[in-house]
Amino acid sequence: MSETINVKIITPLNIVFEEQAKMITLPGEEGEFGVLQGHAPMIVSLKAGLLKVYIDDMHKPKITYLIANGVTEVTGSYINIATETAINITDLSEAEIENKLTALQKSI
């Protein structure tokens, strides 16, 4: 059994991310949750917040996205995330992240 899950992040404009990951954490309406390979199937509403992709190390995210509202479909081997917006904030400064967050909140 593989230790990775296939991840696809989709916005209305394009596929933002499509790769395998060890774990994903997402901002669900009921709170933050994580998904690993083999997770039980589910469909969950997402709220605006941070989506973290753990590719090599399960203790440190490799990529972090600021997302708007959306929905995710999880099966044991893949996760599809459909969101209004997904902004890669991995390499941004704290001030740049605050600016992106403020702009996102105003657009919602």
Swiss-Prot record:
For this protein, the record's CDD domains field holds:
F1-ATPase_delta
Regarding the membrane, this protein is recorded as: Peripheral membrane protein
Which family is annotated?
Belongs to the ATPase epsilon chain family.
Give me the Gene Ontology terms describing cellular component. Answer: plasma membrane; proton-transporting ATP synthase complex
Q: Which GO terms describe its molecular function?
A: ATP binding; proton-transporting ATP synthase activity, rotational mechanism
Keywords, in A-Z order: ATP synthesis, Cell inner membrane, Cell membrane, CF(1), Hydrogen ion transport, Ion transport, Membrane, Transport
Database matches in InterPro entries:
ATP_synth_F1_dsu/esu, ATP_synth_F1_dsu/esu_N, ATPsynth_dsu/esu_N
Q: Which Gene3D superfamilies does the entry link to? A: F0F1 ATP synthase delta/epsilon subunit, N-terminal
Q: What gene is this protein translated from?
A: atpC
What does the UniProt entry say about where the protein is found?
A: Cell inner membrane
Describe its assembly.
Answer: F-type ATPases have 2 components, CF(1) - the catalytic core - and CF(0) - the membrane proton channel. CF(1) has five subunits: alpha(3), beta(3), gamma(1), delta(1), epsilon(1). CF(0) has three main subunits: a, b and c.
What protein is this chain from? Answer: ATP synthase epsilon chain
Source species: Rickettsia bellii (strain OSU 85-389)
Function recorded in the entry: Produces ATP from ADP in the presence of a proton gradient across the membrane.
